């Protein structure tokens, strides 16, 4: 059974903004809801909250997300991007693409993105993103980027209904994945790409969404 260690994650991330504060809960209803409950106007962006198990994880359109205990990465990031609430799809695209590229770079698995928020391996869903934004008085807008990744589930861990459509990284690799190491790599990439991409939105120079917007499914290279 894999357990995430908050302090070890924090040390490994060094000066990263995303991951400047890390919380690991054994169980919560939804990591997005847990972050929203913690956030105040003074909460700095970069807080990351993991849960070893979600009892009411959800995806787009409030679809239920199965979150097997200790078998995946279920987490949410508190952000304060300088974008309008109506542009939250940009955050969804950023998170999905960064998850996909990290899977490719770290595990050498072929990955596709199925809009608006699914990351797929072998044409099956391995990860999903749910971004929610809120206006706050006297503070930049609050964005919560929820990410769920199936890491070490076996086929039996998925319900019969999901088995034809879901996969884990371990199933695709035929071996378990070190969740702590993968989490560090992903958070580093999320931190770097968040700063790079959102800094370029004001000038209209972002290259991330051009391709994502124009294709319903595309392969990550």
Per-region residue spans from a language model:
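N-terminal lobe of the biotin/lipoate ligase/transferase fold
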Residues: 1-106, 177, 195
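Long, positively charged amphipathic alpha-helical accessory segments at protein N-termini or as interdomain linkers
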Residues: 17, 85-111, 121-221
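Short loop/edge segments at beta-strand edges and connector loops
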Residues: 26, 113-115
């Amino acid at each position: 059974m894999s357990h995430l260690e908050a302090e070890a994650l924090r040390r490994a991330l060094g000066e990263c903004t995303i991951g400047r504060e890390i919380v690991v809960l054994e169980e919560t209803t939804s990591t997005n809801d847990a972050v929203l409950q913690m956030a105040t106007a003074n909460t700095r962006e970069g807080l990351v909250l993991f849960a070893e198990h979600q009892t009411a994880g959800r995806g787009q359109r409030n679809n239920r997300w199965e979150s097997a205990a200790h078998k995946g990465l279920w987490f949410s990031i508190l952000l304060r991007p300088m974008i309008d609430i109506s542009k939250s799809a940009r955050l969804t695209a950023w998170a999905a693409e960064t998850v996909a590229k990290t899977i490719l770079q770290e595990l050498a698995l072929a990955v596709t993105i199925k809009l608006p928020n699914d990351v797929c391996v072998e044409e099956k869903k391995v990860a999903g993103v749910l971004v929610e934004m809120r206006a706050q008085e006297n503070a930049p807008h609050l964005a919560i980027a929820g990410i769920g990744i199936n890491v070490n589930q076996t086929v039996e861990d998925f319900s019969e209904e999901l088995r034809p459509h879901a996969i884990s990284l371990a199933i695709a690799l035929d071996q378990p994945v070190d969740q702590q190491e993968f989490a560090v790599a992903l958070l580093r990439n999320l931190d770097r790409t968040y700063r790079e991409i959102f800094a370029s939105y004001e000038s209209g120079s972002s290259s991330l969404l051009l391709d994502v917007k124009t294709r319903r499914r595309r392969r990550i290279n």
